[in-house]
């Protein structure tokens, strides 16, 4: 019984964890639920529209994760500075995030404006001149051009929301996010279908609604944060300068560059995996889109608990409470895995139901249901990997997380998917299962690294 105690916390522990995780879970859950409804709305218009939107979102996902990686590199320091009570340290990490975010956003807009067609064509295999392919390409281009207008507000929401969360404030980003997703949902309905006298815009309407919701979310976060400077102390004199001390810049670049590269290469790896699967036909792209949208709804559990590891353990490390950090981390990982066994079983049970909501072929629905079951089987694995990743990251072990995450996907997962999809007669279901199975190797590596305690360090100690 004593041996099991290290994996199980008391009631106060779980209330503390849920206090951090639940707002993130609720925000991401509502966001992903509305994304599901958005996806169904676009799916009701047609398979080509749904596939075009899915391809563009896969490409924009790379930008999203570049921003996430850019702010997370500095965020390691933000959490520990906050734990230390150093407000100026928090301000300087925010300013670093601002610089890196503006550079990445400008680069993304330039690339997507200049090379949108060849990028979308990567996912359109088969007869490039076919009517279905040309329609999917046209819808994708129209959708992307509007979505690029929404990149600046997305950036500013990430800058503020990440800093607020690293300072233990999860409610404000949650409330802003919930408001935004409902704005998105309402205007999706109006603009996609042309309700209440509005023009029927289809995929362009879906993009316009998303962009509008992002500006609403940005306005809420900025106004509420700067309107309460006593509570959010880092906002005092935040823009008095945008200079970042050279010593801190060097520290963040050393610790944070591997993290940013990790997110970028990992997102690129995921995009290439999707391209490998798309070799098996446009139906696979549509089915994967349905599966991924539904999977994201369930994935909010282990994602929120992973974020909780970064926040809770990061603050304990910054305060120098190493033994408490180690004990807390063990309990958090165990809680995440056990909870995701239950969530995965629930997801597998409802797998056949969701694809029926889409206006697509029976083949695509059947394919999507099988993909959902396969993802459900690996949910506990993903929970362990996610918690391990954030454990290592909270202690500044970003080189290790770079090897653990993005190097692995490019050296192992992508070659496996590439070879199986192009040089074997295996079904797409078998290929998908085998590619996910190689993550078990990462589980072993993650277990060893976390158990050894290589992450137990205070990176902001004077």
Name the predicted role of every residue range.
Residues 1-21, 78-150, 198-256, 313-378, ...:
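Short alpha-helical transmembrane segments in multi-pass integral membrane proteins
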Residues 47-58, 140, 144, 207, ...:
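Small-residue hotspots at the loop-to-helix junctions and early N-terminal turns
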Residues 26, 38-42, 53, 78-83, ...:
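Hydrophobic/aromatic residues within transmembrane alpha-helices of membrane transport systems
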């Amino acid at each position: 019984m004593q041996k099991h105690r290290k994996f199980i916390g008391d009631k106060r522990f779980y209330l503390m964890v849920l206090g951090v995780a639940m707002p993130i879970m609720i925000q991401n859950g509502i966001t992903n639920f509305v994304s599901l409804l958005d996806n169904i709305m676009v799916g009701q218009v047609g398979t080509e529209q749904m596939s075009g939107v899915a391809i563009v979102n896969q490409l924009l996902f790379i930008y999203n994760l570049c921003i996430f990686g850019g702010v997370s590199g500095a965020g390691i320091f933000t959490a520990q500075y906050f734990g230390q009570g150093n407000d100026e340290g928090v301000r300087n990490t925010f300013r670093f995030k601002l610089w890196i975010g503006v550079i990445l956003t400008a680069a993304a807009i330039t690339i997507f404006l200049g090379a949108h067609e060849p990028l979308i064509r990567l996912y359109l295999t088969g007869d490039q001149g076919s009517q279905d392919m040309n329609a999917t390409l046209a819808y994708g281009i129209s959708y992307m051009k509007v979505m690029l207008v929404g990149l600046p507000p997305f950036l500013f929401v990430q800058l503020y929301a990440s800093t607020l969360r690293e300072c233990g404030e999860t409610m404000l980003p949650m409330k802003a996010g919930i408001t935004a997703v409902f704005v998105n949902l309402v205007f999706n309905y109006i603009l996609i279908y042309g309700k209440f006298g509005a023009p029927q815009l289809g995929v362009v309407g879906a993009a316009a609604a998303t962009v509008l919701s992002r500006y609403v979310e940005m306005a809420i976060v900025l106004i509420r944060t700067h309107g309460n400077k006593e509570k959010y102390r880092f906002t005092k004199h935040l823009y008095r300068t945008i200079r970042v001390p050279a010593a801190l810049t060097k520290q963040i670049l050393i610790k944070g560059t591997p993290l940013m590269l990790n997110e970028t290469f990992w997102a690129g790896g995921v995009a290439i995996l999707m391209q490998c699967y798309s070799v098996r036909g446009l139906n696979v792209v549509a089915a994967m889109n349905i599966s991924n949208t539904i999977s994201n709804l369930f994935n909010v559990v282990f994602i929120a608990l992973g974020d909780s590891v970064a926040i809770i353990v990061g603050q304990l490390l910054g305060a120098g409470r190493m033994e408490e950090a180690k004990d807390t981390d063990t309990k958090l990982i165990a809680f995440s895995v056990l909870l995701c066994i239950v969530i995965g079983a629930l997801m597998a049970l409802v797998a056949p139901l969701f694809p029926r909501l889409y206006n697509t072929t029976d083949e695509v629905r059947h394919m999507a249901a099988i993909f959902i079951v396969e993802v459900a089987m690996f949910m506990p694995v993903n929970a362990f990997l996610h918690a391990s990743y954030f454990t290592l990251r909270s202690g500044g072990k970003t080189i290790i997380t770079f090897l653990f995450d993005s190097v692995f996907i490019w050296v192992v997962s992508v070659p496996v998917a590439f070879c199986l999809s192009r040089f074997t007669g295996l079904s797409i279901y078998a290929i998908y299962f085998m590619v996910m199975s190689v993550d078990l190797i990462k589980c072993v590596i993650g277990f060893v690294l976390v158990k050894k305690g290589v992450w137990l360090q205070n990176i902001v100690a004077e």
